[in-house]
């Protein structure tokens, strides 16, 4: 909470390939030491690998019945957004000191914070995976998130479990 004035949010330009602000934010989260072109290469490569895997899964489910191909760029973005939605938390716990005790108070997460947390968790989970190369790690983690499994989804489940366990302290909320 600023003392002087509210600081305006910086406008993020959409990414050059898919024209998506969400993807541009994700690239910025993935970026290390200002090397954006490398982060873009990793992200776009991971998305193409993810798209191939999803198409293979859907083709196996349909048993070869072709329904027509959807727009590649739109399909990839939909898969990415669905993976991100599966990781985004809706509640989290925050420490609140009351008297001499510190309580973990469950609080609802704002929309923009939940997106940021989801992106951060996906990147962290991808970095700890065992595959060779960040592109394959990120593709694997995005696929796991798309299928509602994996480390990032587990992190969200743990956060929700913690909030559920501390529901008794919800009346200590300060807003």
UniProtKB/Swiss-Prot annotation:
Pfam families: Ribosomal_S7. One of the primary rRNA binding proteins, it binds directly to 16S rRNA where it nucleates assembly of the head domain of the 30S subunit. Is located at the subunit interface close to the decoding center, probably blocks exit of the E-site tRNA. Belongs to the universal ribosomal protein uS7 family. This is Small ribosomal subunit protein uS7. It comes from the Bacteria. One of its GO terms (biological process) is translation. InterPro entries: Ribosomal_uS7 (IPR000235), Ribosomal_uS7_bac/org-type (IPR005717), Ribosomal_uS7_dom (IPR023798), Ribosomal_uS7_dom_sf (IPR036823). Keywords: Ribonucleoprotein, Ribosomal protein, RNA-binding, rRNA-binding, tRNA-binding. Part of the 30S ribosomal subunit. Contacts proteins S9 and S11. The gene is rpsG. CDD domains: uS7_Bacteria. GO terms for cellular component: small ribosomal subunit. GO terms for molecular function: rRNA binding; structural constituent of ribosome; tRNA binding.
